[in-house]
Swiss-Prot record:
Stretches that traverse the bilayer: none
Keyword Hydrolase: yes
One GO biological process term: acylglycerol catabolic process
Source species of the chain: Mycobacterium tuberculosis (strain CDC 1551 / Oshkosh)
Entry-linked Gene3D superfamilies: alpha/beta hydrolase
Keywords: Hydrolase
Keyword Electron transport included in the entry's annotation: no
The protein's name: Putative hydrolase LipZ
GO cellular component: membrane
Cited PANTHER family: HYDROLASE, PUTATIVE (AFU_ORTHOLOGUE AFUA_2G14860)-RELATED (PTHR43798:SF33), MONOACYLGLYCEROL LIPASE (PTHR43798)
């Protein structure tokens, strides 16, 4: 690992042992409720590093899901969003005292909908007060999947994973940023290093199974968006080519009362492209 930004992020965190592997966790003190930041695919909690300074004294905790970032990346392993939700519960139990609010991006939005469903079932072991979903294809049939996502889900997925290169990753990753806020060379290098940590660049075909879970558990997770009785809002980069405004419109149909902050001119990674605007939008929905 050579990027100073990655080393600094790693050195400020710790690893929490779990039954399935060590999970990287970072947290900071501040006012409650604690803000839980959940990342997406194929990146990590590193995505939120520039958001955290704008949280205006709010307590926060973030983690790398199993198989991502600086967490362990076992293989073979049947990766599941249900397991990731269990790991969130473990991290919260070891890190947080008191109430929690969630800010979730991309894949993390589906982990969050499972947490909402567990709360509806009376099975969530922590006090979740509010949630914000951001640029996640919760309603998969409304999303515009990238070609590499389709290949990784296919029988050719293991072959495609072995062929992943830094150049190919950088080109593909860069296409989901907005033209006004392009992917920088430094960000691309850091993201590639985190992907490759613990040979993670060899398992994207295993991790991509979360898309199938979005179909399998659609009734449960869409129902949670519709029926969860606490404040739920959406923060959305409107120039996202993957989780497009078509997804956002579907979420609005599921939950017409939801508060929405639209971020024009931002792509799939609004927290990287415009961290201050993203943080302010999230805080406006999560903190009284």
């Amino acid at each position: 690992m050579t990027s100073p930004s990655v080393r600094e992020w790693r050195d400020g965190g710790r690893w929490l042992p779990t039954a399935v592997g060590k999970v990287f966790v970072r947290s900071g003190p501040g006012d409650t409720p604690t803000m839980l930041l959940l990342h997406g695919y194929p990146s990590s909690s590193f995505d939120f590093r520039a958001v955290i300074p704008h949280l205006t004294g709010q307590a926060w905790v973030t983690m790398d899901f199993l198989g991502f970032g600086l967490s362990d990346k076992p293989r073979p392993h049947r990766y599941s969003l249900l397991e990731q939700a269990h790991l969130v519960e473990t991290v919260v139990a070891h890190t947080v005292t008191g109430a929690v609010v969630v800010l979730a991006h991309d894949m993390g939005t589906s982990v969050t909908t499972e947490l909402l469903a567990r709360d509806l079932d009376g099975r969530l072991p922590f006090d979740l007060r509010r949630a914000v979903l951001s640029n996640g294809s919760v309603i998969l049939e409304r999303a515009s999947l990238r070609p590499i996502q389709k290949v990784l889900r296919s029988p050719l997925g293991p072959v495609a994973a072995r062929l992943v290169s830094r150049g190919g990753f950088t080109r593909g990753f860069g296409r989901i940023f907005s033209p006004a806020h392009p992917l920088s060379a430094q960000e691309a290098q850091a993201q590639w290093e985190l992907l490759c940590y613990n040979d993670g660049n060899r398992i994207p075909h295993l991790l991509i199974s979360y898309l199938d879970e979005r179909i399998r558990h659609a009734q449960r997770w869409h129902g949670a968006v519709r029926d969860w009785p606490k404040p739920l809002g959406f923060v959305w980069g409107l120039d996202d080519p993957v989780a497009t405004t078509n997804v956002l419109n579907g979420l609005r149909e599921l939950r017409p009362s939801a508060a929405v902050v639209e971020l024009p001119g931002l792509g799939h990674y609004p927290q990287v492209e415009a961290p201050k605007a993203y943080a302010e939008a999230a805080l406006s929905l999560l903190v009284d």
